[in-house]
From Swiss-Prot:
GO terms for biological process: NAD biosynthetic process. The gene is nadD. PANTHER family: NICOTINATE-NUCLEOTIDE ADENYLYLTRANSFERASE-RELATED (PTHR39321), PHOSPHOPANTETHEINE ADENYLYLTRANSFERASE (PTHR39321:SF3). This is Probable nicotinate-nucleotide adenylyltransferase. Catalyzes the reversible adenylation of nicotinate mononucleotide (NaMN) to nicotinic acid adenine dinucleotide (NaAD). Keywords: ATP-binding, NAD, Nucleotide-binding, Nucleotidyltransferase, Pyridine nucleotide biosynthesis, Transferase. GO terms for molecular function: ATP binding; nicotinate-nucleotide adenylyltransferase activity. It catalyses: nicotinate beta-D-ribonucleotide + ATP + H(+) = deamido-NAD(+) + diphosphate.
């Protein structure tokens, strides 16, 4: 059975922390592919934010060297609000017999019970969780306790041993705006940023 991982995010810009956790996701779950899903709308209020087309281009460039990585624009081309459940449904229709895995940070796990159709979502996809520094499963809201306990036991939720890297896209954008450079960006994406004058003041 094919295993497909789904990794949504703003990727504004994509950075080495994203690639690190995507590789850990693929390795630990044994995925055939990890599909990066750049979000559509303008999620940042500051002006130094890249367009959906630029973010998509940067993700495509940054992921090109790993054959397991793919990129989808499905969250960009959909009009209006995009919800994880709807995104997963698109992939379920495309790959009806595949085992789907959704990657989320532990901060998202703590709020999962507030997501649209979350109980239907977790029936359609397995969940891989990357723990952020300082987070613990003991902090999980009681609304999720029964589901999480059962899912950890049956393997439909996996906690990755690799933690979420403490890299901030906000800080990267700030450094690019003030200094024109920032550590932690894949070289191909950094070149694109320079060539297109992204994140300048």
């Amino acid at each position: 059975m094919k295993k497909i991982g789904l990794f949504g995010g703003t990727f504004d810009p994509i950075h080495n922390g994203h690639l690190h956790i995507a590789r850990a996701f693929a390795d630990e779950i044994g995925l055939d592919a990890v599909v990066f899903l750049p979000a559509g709308g303008p999620y940042h209020k500051d002006a130094a934010s890249a367009s959906a087309a630029d973010r998509l281009a940067m993700v495509e460039l940054a992921t090109a060297e790993d054959a397991r990585f793919a990129v989808s624009d499905c969250d960009i081309v959909r009009e209006g609000a995009t919800y994880t459940f709807d995104t997963v449904q698109i992939f379920r229709q495309q790959f009806p017999s595949a085992q789907l895995w959704w990657l989320m940070g532990s901060d998202s796990l703590m709020k999962l019970h507030t997501w649209k159709k979350w109980q239907m979502l977790v029936r359609e996809t397995n969940i891989a969780v990357a723990m952020r520094q300082g987070d613990s499963l003991h902090q999980t809201p009681r609304e999720l306790h029964a589901w999480l306990g059962k899912s950890l036991q049956d393997g439909s939720v996996r906690i990755l041993s690799a933690p979420m890297h403490n890299v901030s896209s906000t800080e990267i954008r700030r450094n690019l705006a003030s200094q024109g450079v920032s550590d932690g960006i894949p070289p191909a994406a950094a070149r694109y940023i320079r060539e297109h004058g992204l994140y300048e003041k």
